[in-house]
Amino acid sequence: VNVTVQIEPATDIPSAVEYRWDTDTAILTASLADSAYADGASGSVELAGSDGSWVILDVRGGRIHGVEVAVWPDVKKLSALRVPADTSRGRLVVPSAGSKGGVAMMQMDTTLIAESDQSEQTIHFRLGAGRHARTVCIARDILVDLDESDIIRGIWLLNVPPFPGDE
């Protein structure tokens, strides 16, 4: 199952990202600092990996406003993890089949692979088997890979703070 999005152009300065670790559960939350709302559904898109991992997209006003890693997949540390240099700015809108402004919840089962740099400050989640065609910057430290059909194929979290106690 795939998550297809629509891209809205963004000309403003990219939003800052607020990272928060839950030390009891190791849940990492990355939220856009801006609170601009638009019309559309609010809720979550839950991406369930075949290994039991969970990544959740926070949707407010139809737009992706954050990422939560609820259950971590095995993270493969790479000696060199290259962040895409050729990105475009945009807002990602999750189309809603429900009523305008309603609460939406979708669950998608997919292959979920996590890679990081050696310091674990850059983390890349790959979704499904498709290939990405472009990368959209939705916030200062969140990038999203899309394929040619605007299906989400990856999520980048940049400048991730260390887990408390691992510093």
Language model segments and positions:
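Intrinsic disorder/low-complexity detector
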Residues: 1-42, 46, 55-57, 66-123, ...
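Short solvent-exposed loop/turn micro-motifs enriched in small/polar/acidic residues
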Residues: 48-50, 107, 136-139
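Short, structured motif recognition centered on aromatic/hydrophobic residues
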Residues: 53-68, 123-125, 144, 152-157
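Well-ordered beta-strand positions
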Residues: 56-60, 115-117, 136-137, 145-147
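Residues that cap or initiate secondary-structure elements
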Residues: 63, 73-75, 131-133, 161
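Extended, Lys/Arg-enriched charged tracts that mediate electrostatic binding to polyanionic substrates
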Residues: 125-131
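Mixed-charge, glycine-accented linear interaction segment located at domain edges/termini
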Residues: 132-167
